[in-house]
Each structure stands twice: as C-alpha cells, then as structure tokens.
Amino acid sequence: MARKTPIERYRNIGISAHIDAGKTTTTERILFYTGVNHKIGEVHDGAATMDWMEQEQERGITITSAATTCFWKGMEMSFPEHRFNIIDTPGHVDFTIEVERSMRVLDGACMVYCAVGGVQPQSETVWRQATKYKVPRLAFVNKMDRQGANFFKVVEQMKLRLKANPVPIVIPIGAEENFVGVVDLVRMKAIYWDEASQGMKFDYREIPGELQATAEEWREKMLEAAAEASEELMNEYLENGDLSHEKIVAGLRQRTIACEIQPMLCGTAFKNKGVQRMLDAVIELLPSPVDIPPVAGIDDYEKPVERRADDSEKFAALAFKLMTDPFVGQLTFVRVYSGVLKSGETVLNSVKGKKERIGRILQMHANERQEIKEVLAGDIAACVGLKEVTTGETLCDPSAPIILERMVFPEPVIHVAVEPKTKADQEKMGIALGRLAAEDPSFRVRTDEESGQTIISGMGELHLEILVDRMKREFNVEATVGAPQVAYREAIRKPVEQEGKFVKQSGGRGQFGHVWIKLEPNETGKGYEFIDAIKGGVVPREYIPAVDKGLQETLPNGVLAGFPVVDVKVTLFDGSYHDVDSNENAFKMAASMAFKDAMRKASPVLLEPMMAVVVETPEDYMGNVMGDLSGRRGIVQGMDDLPGGMKEVKAEVPLAEMFGYATQLRSLTQGRATYSMEFKHYSEAPKSVAEAVINNRK
C-alpha cells in the first residue's frame, strides 16, 4: 500500500495543559475543524469525544491519553493535506505518568494555558517533562473571552516560571467579552472569525488603529527571534529591517524544533476563535518525524544503533500505552519509528526476548476505531492480540533487534489495602488488578505476606480512587478499600563492617557460607549498589551472584519496621568457603544475615515521602491556609500574588499529613481554594513520627 501522506506531512503532537485550561475543548475544536466531528462535544455536558471513559465524563477531567488521527489543509486550504496524530494528555497531577509516556512518543506539543489562571503548578510539571524529552512546543493561551483574561501576563509568567522563551506570533484584539479576533504578526493582518459558522469562516482585515503600535512592537520581537536562526537571516534583517513571510516561518521553525523558542498564539476554543490559526502553526512550525534526530537504542550486543523515520528501514516501535477495550480486549498503542508493520506479522519484543503475532491493527479516533492493514513509519496506532507486552517495551523486526530507550516510571507513594466483598469477586479482582497494572506502570499490586491482604499502590488518592472505580465498572468487582498508607522507606546513616556466617552440620552434607561485608550509605536516589572486592578467591566466583541475590532479597524488609531499604552500597570484601559444604544457598543466607546485623548497627532511619504542595487561595484565607500547613509539618517555600486577589502558597509537606486535605481546605476557605500536590523526594522522618510508625507496625 503506497503512502497516502508523505512522512514530511505528519505531525505527532500532544495537547497538554493544567486542569481547566480548556484542553479537551481545544482538542474537540481541532477535531471539528479538521472535519472528524460534525457536532462539537462540550466538556460541560460530559460529551467530549476525547474523554471517553465514564469516570472522565463524570469528573470532567481527562485521565487517559486518547490517540486520534485527523487531517488539515490550513485555514485558507493553502497547505497540502497534513496528517495529525493527536494525543490528548491529562492535566491532573495524579496522572503525570500519562503525560510522561505520551511525551516520550511525541514530536511536538501544544501547551494550552488559561488566559486568566496563567501558568499553574501542573503546567510546570508538564513543561519539565517536555524539556526532558526535548519536545518542541507551541503555546496557546485559551479562554481569552473570560473575565480577567490577560495574554501578555501569561507571556511574562512563561518567562518567569518556566524559564521559557515565548515568541508571540499573534496578539489578541480586545479581551474578556470584547475579545473579537487576533492580529497575525507574520502577515500583519487582523483575523476575525465568523461566529455563525462556528469559526469555519473568517476574514482578514486591516489592523485596528489603536493596536498598530503594539502590533509593530511585537512583530519586531518576532522578527529578531526568527533572524537569530542563522547568520544569513540576521544579516538580511539588519540590512532591510524586515524579512519575507517564508523566511520568518523558516527561521521560527528552525528555532522551535531546536527547542530554543516557543511560538505563542491565543484565542478561545469555546467561542471558536484562534484554534484554526494554531493548527496552521502546527504545520508551519512543529517538526515531522524526519525533522527530529533518528531514534536511538541498543542492539543485542548493547551497541548503540539508530533508526531513521523511513519505511524502508527495519521495523521498530515503542509500546507506550496499554488499554483494555470492552469489545476487542487489550489494545497496545505503538509509535512506529521506522519500517512498516502489517497485521498478521510476527514481531520481537526485544526487552523480553519473546516473539508475538500482531492480530488486527486499529487507527483510533478517540474511542471509535477503524481497522487498517498496515502501519507506516511515523505513525501511531493500536494493535490487538499482543499478550506479553507492557508499557515502555520495544517491538521490532526479529531479524534486526533493537531496544529503544525505556521510560522511567516513578515509584508509588501511597498504598491502600483492597478486599473483595464476596468469594466470587476474589478471582475477578486478581484478573482486574493484573490488567490495570499492565496498563499503568505507576500502579503496583502485591500481596502482604503477613496479613494476606492485597495492597495496591499509586501516585495519589485520586489515582487509586479512579482505579478502584474502574475495577467496579469495567470488571464488575466490588471491593472494600482500607485507609491509605504511606510508603515509608528505611536507610542508614553510617558505614559498618559485618560478618555473616551460615553453618549447618548434620549427618551427611552440611551447609557452609561465610562473608564479610561493608555496608555504607549511598547517594540519595542511587538505590542499591553491590561491589565485589574479593581478592584471591576467598569466596569462589560462582558464589558471588548468590551473595548479591541474598542481599537483594533482604532489601524489601528493613530492620526498623519492615519497610524497603534504599540508597545503600554493599561491598563484599572477605569470607571463606568449604570444599564440600559450601553452596549458593549457604552464601545467600550468610549475606542476608550479615546485611540484617549490619543494618541494625548502621544507625538506621525512617524516610517519609515529602510532597510539593501548591495552594491557590483568596487572600482573606491566607492565614488559615498557612496555619493549617504548618500544623501538618509543612515548610512554606514561597508565596506569589495571583490575579483577582488570589495568593499562591508553595510548601513541602509530608504525605502522611496530607490525607483528607481536600476536605479540610474546602472548609477553611469556603470551597474557594484549590491545591495540587506531587511527590518531591524522601527525607528523614522526625524521631517522634518514626517512633509512632514503628510502634504501629509491631
């Protein structure tokens, strides 16, 4: 099958934003203008096309990144047809993982900001993720028709809070209820959209007199940004004081793709103004799969290899998301980086070393699907029939193995125990939790060995609430949920040397393992590190992996209260063996005993998860909010003024103190304050807290 759309005309983009910046509405409008949706879905009615899980429609927030394909030829139909693969990403901080995994497979992103709220805490998180994956960005300032809308304030906030380099390519005509259109700084024309046609029709007019000077000032800034792309452009700009339309676009495009600038647009998606110009900017300024460096990975021999975005290359794709579909079962969303994948073919999961057969291939439009025979380089599609794949693994041509860089998922910080209500629910719950954990790598399931309870862990209360809710709706499992528990950790403060000896003499063959280890604190975040410093074979080579294994098996249960031990370095430096009685198991036991004894002597401490909390509150309630945060052992790290007499408080608070905060904040501020929180780091718990936690576990 020949390509319908050349790869240069592909745009794989994400629409990303803070909750309530109007992201889903913006995506809806994109689908409307590109002709996919005939009736615009409104989030207010719970009818948006991209928010297709029931919980999303009820809560009016987007949880899963739905992937959609649509086509655009430009506002004036002046471009050849471009193919957009759009990933809608959630804005709630508990679903940061969803944003992270979509950033990994995007070539560009549109950041949507609210013209009133501006750059909010979640926007900063998303911005960091986009920077981490070097994703070129455009910014769209939405809700220009709202009370308090201020485009230029958002430009300043982007510089201050995100350390961004925003370059407006349009400026608004009017604001709040007087917002009527935009001045296009590239064409130096005013654009007015026709409300009766839901923004399908528009016309160019002269720039209103009172805006002429402002428009010229901002055009000057845009020209400078474009001219900095190359010496040639800079010289032309300095000589002529201007650049042609084509050269402005070329200069801005080059610098946007290099992540040096972020072109800015504005509008109101709800009132059908401005989104159309943003779509043109996606074509003009964001990269196609061939404009970005080839994707890098390693082959079977751990040698670096690259794959270009080309159909003639060997097939390589990244599975970036799993979803359970009520009709076809498990869907695996893949981003194809190189080559072609046909339905019915066998591919290699290079991470697990297993081959799998691709059943059907579906192109998704939110939750509607169209079956296709093959998927080409640069595309995003969903495969049916893959059983072993989990998020972040590579699928490739079995004749040319490659492992693409994996995604790193955060460790969960909150646990709850779940118990099925009936015996019949027991088995169904196991299947349901297994499916949900395969879909979402930041969600873990385990069985507590002592109590036999099933423990689920995630990134926040809302995260777990929604997963329990999905268990009920999608799998018909009724479960009772316990109170949330904090994921504490244990660490040590001083180095110690310790002997471990496991000797068992009984008739016949005995057991003998003997080691000396040095246990010392490791850098924060480094985790466990094992160093083999054995000289002269005092512990034979073949037993050293057993020592490492014995140590690793002891890590999940610390000596203070049985919490996992983190950030330790263990050096095996001496020991002895017995020709007949030594075996792997004996050395494993000796290492485990040495570790436990060493840990007790190494000043063990309890670590608790600290959360970065951002509260937005009316000034009148500032005292209550601050007092409450200090009462929760919070450390206030900064305050900012926000528009409309609001204040922003940033604090670091232990997770243990944050349960039920939403309800408390509501009553403190009569429901007028909002907050967001995300995991920051682990830090040593105060003595009184540690003692209470340890006594509780006994």
Curated annotation (Swiss-Prot):
GO molecular function, one term: translation elongation factor activity
GO cellular component assignments: cytoplasm
Protein name per UniProt: Elongation factor G
Domain tr-type G intervals: 8-290
UniProt keyword GTP-binding, yes or no: yes
Pfam family, one: GTP_EFTU_D2
A Gene Ontology biological process term: ribosome disassembly
Lineage top rank: taxon: Bacteria
Binding site for GTP: 17-24, 88-92, 142-145
UniProt key word Transcription: no
Record's keyword terms, sorted: Cytoplasm, Elongation factor, GTP-binding, Nucleotide-binding, Protein biosynthesis
Family designation: Belongs to the TRAFAC class translation factor GTPase superfamily. Classic translation factor GTPase family. EF-G/EF-2 subfamily.
Subcellular location field: Cytoplasm
Summary of the function given for this chain in its UniProt record: Catalyzes the GTP-dependent ribosomal translocation step during translation elongation. During this step, the ribosome changes from the pre-translocational (PRE) to the post-translocational (POST) state as the newly formed A-site-bound peptidyl-tRNA and P-site-bound deacylated tRNA move to the P and E sites, respectively. Catalyzes the coordinated movement of the two tRNA molecules, the mRNA and conformational changes in the ribosome.
